[in-house]
């Protein structure tokens, strides 16, 4: 009987919660990464260099870094229903305003504010999952959720390419402006609906029966009824050294993720040539392959309980893919693109097992704060990598040094994960 209750509760939660969270995360990555496809248009219309483009891409994460922990405190204070709505509406506004910028400074301001508004979204979603799902289900749920990272690029790349390939203005807007406006409006609409679509705790959910609610309140990590969250609990999470170590490792992984995502369209264009729509179709291939493999890889990692080893191995594979792409960059476009596919698979399959480790360190407000530390410090890599690659591109006139930089970050982080986590019984960093 308890097993039947458990299965029924998890099935209902998975059907009701996960698709909506996947949609929200899809929109986040769409608005975060669509600028990569507008690089040439922004260069022509705003006079951006590669360094300036990298800076504009990366400054998003400065805003994200500065406001991540305060935003997580907002999730605790106001509850996910209200705070998710605030995040979605505000980020949608600034994502849309990107279509109206006229100078590099306006672009920098809008990208910075987009980061400020979106800050705390991912840790808040992880926190929300832990409220509803017991620990043993979280890696699988995160695996389903994080498929969205490559999937949003796989789906978003041809959409962005199609919009940018429009040959004339619509309603007075150039194609690059339409890209930001059309992809910025949906979060605003969904943000207005969010308070009616989600609840803050299993006990408030109408589609669960009494037995299912009772089981979840007893087994889900962060939904103890009647417990009051204090500031001291929150500060414990920030001071936890395990979270700080994971944050540093996350920095290296994020350098790979956002450095790769920001510069992939430009790299493919340099390798293969062609218009932006052709480039966007080629970009679909590595992202699509990564999306197919993220979930089975996360299931395998969860089954073996060697999360850190699996995450580290993925990062090493990604580094090999990037170095292979550099090696064949000028000699064989097909082989270079194949190595970029390997890099994408490695980068994105690393994410679910890696993020499942800090999610299981503690509970309550301490966990929310700790996850925010991991995310916000790690996301500094989202500024460093795109900007560094842009600077290297300007200095050398080649994409190769930038790709080697990303490969080095991933290789070092992956080897540290494997070295430390292989020693631990559960395959995670415990000391």
Each predicted region: which residue ranges?
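Conserved MFS/SLC helix-loop-helix module at the cytosolic interface between two early adjacent transmembrane helices
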Residues: 66-105
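Helix-to-loop junctions at the C-terminal end of transmembrane segments
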Residues: 67-80, 292-306, 393
């Amino acid at each position: 009987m308890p097993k039947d209750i458990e299965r029924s509760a998890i099935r209902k939660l998975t059907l009701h919660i996960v698709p909506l969270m996947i949609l929200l995360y899809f929109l986040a990555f769409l608005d975060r990464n669509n600028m990569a496809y507008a690089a040439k248009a922004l260069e022509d219309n705003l006079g951006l260099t590669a360094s300036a483009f990298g800076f504009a891409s990366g400054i998003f994460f400065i805003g994200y870094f500065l406001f991540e922990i305060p935003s997580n405190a907002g999730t605790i204070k106001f509850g996910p229903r209200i705070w998710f709505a605030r995040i979605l509406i505000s980020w949608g506004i600034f994502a849309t305003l990107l279509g109206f910028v006229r100078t590099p400074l306006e672009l920098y301001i809008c990208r910075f504010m987009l980061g400020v508004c979106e800050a705390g979204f991912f840790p808040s979603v992880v926190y929300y999952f832990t409220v509803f799902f017991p620990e043993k289900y979280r890696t699988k749920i995160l695996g389903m959720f994080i498929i969205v990272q490559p999937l949003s690029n796989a789906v978003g790349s041809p959409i962005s390419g199609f919009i940018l390939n429009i040959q004339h203005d619509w309603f007075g807007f150039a194609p690059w402006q339409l890209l930001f406006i059309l992809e910025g409006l949906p979060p605003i609409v969904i943000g207005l609906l969010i308070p009616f679509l989600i609840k803050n705790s299993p006990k408030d959910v109408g589609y669960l029966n009494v037995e299912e609610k009772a089981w979840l309140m007893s087994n889900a990590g962060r939904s103890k009824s009647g417990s009051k969250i204090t500031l001291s609990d929150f500060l414990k999470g920030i001071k936890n050294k395990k979270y700080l170590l994971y944050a540093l490792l996350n920095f290296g992984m994020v350098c790979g993720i956002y450095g790769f995502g920001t510069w992939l369209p430009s790299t493919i264009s340099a390798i293969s040539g062609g218009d932006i729509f052709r480039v966007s179709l080629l970009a679909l291939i590595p992202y699509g392959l990564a999306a197919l493999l993220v979930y089975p890889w996360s299931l395998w990692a969860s089954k073996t309980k060697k999360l850190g080893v699996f995450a580290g191995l993925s990062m090493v594979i990604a580094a090999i893919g990037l170095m292979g792409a550099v090696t064949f960059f000028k000699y064989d476009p097909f082989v270079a693109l194949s190595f970029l596919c390997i890099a994408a698979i490695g980068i994105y399959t690393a994410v679910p097992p890696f993020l499942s480790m800090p999610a299981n360190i503690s509970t309550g407000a301490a966990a929310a704060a700790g996850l925010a530390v991991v995310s916000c410090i790690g996301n500094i890599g989202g500024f460093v990598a795109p900007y560094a690659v842009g600077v290297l591109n300007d200095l050398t006139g080649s994409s190769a040094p930038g790709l080697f930089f990303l490969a080095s970050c991933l290789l070092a982080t992956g080897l540290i994960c494997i070295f430390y986590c292989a020693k631990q019984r559960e395959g995670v960093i415990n000391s």
